Amino acid sequence: MVKKNYKNITLDAKYTPKKSEPYMCPEQLAYFYQILNAQRDEILHDREAVLNDVRMAEKNESAGVGDEQDQAANEQEITMNLRMSERTTNLLQKINAALERIENGQYGYSVISGEEIGLQRLMARPLATMTVEEQEEYEKKKR
């Protein structure tokens, strides 16, 4: 798998990868790079807002603001926000791994077999790391 220069490509806003193009050509890589970067930026923005909420709730809790019900609600909100932050951290790790695969020329290819994952699958799930068949087999074994 060869590294391809995708960072300097400006795509038309209506561009979508096509089967007629060479698989993981620079335009396709630029497309997925932009999608993944946008997802990462949105998550980082949302995560910062959640962390600010947690800080505020912790501040209120430590200051003893509100009655027992308010404090219980604050504690529940802190717990829920921390769980959500944990999930977003996991998602960020997957996005960063996908961006790294783009960088090293492995994006779009199965981490198991090296086979093409396929444009249709990547369009639906840009974080996919396996072919549909491999994913189904993985899910069966997991049960």
Where do the language-model regions lie?
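Interaction interfaces in information-processing and related assembly proteins
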Residues: 1-104
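Short Cys/His-rich "knuckle" micro-motifs
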Residues: 120-125
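Cysteine-rich micro-motifs
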Residues: 128-135
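Short Fe-S-cluster ligation motifs
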Residues: 136-143
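Residues immediately within or flanking Cys/His clusters that coordinate Zn2+
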Residues: 89, 107, 128
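Short cysteine-rich clusters marking metal-coordination/redox-active sites
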Residues: 110-114, 131
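Short functional micro-motifs and their immediate structural scaffolds
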Residues: 100, 117-118, 139
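Cys/His-coordinated zinc-binding microdomains
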Residues: 36, 114, 135
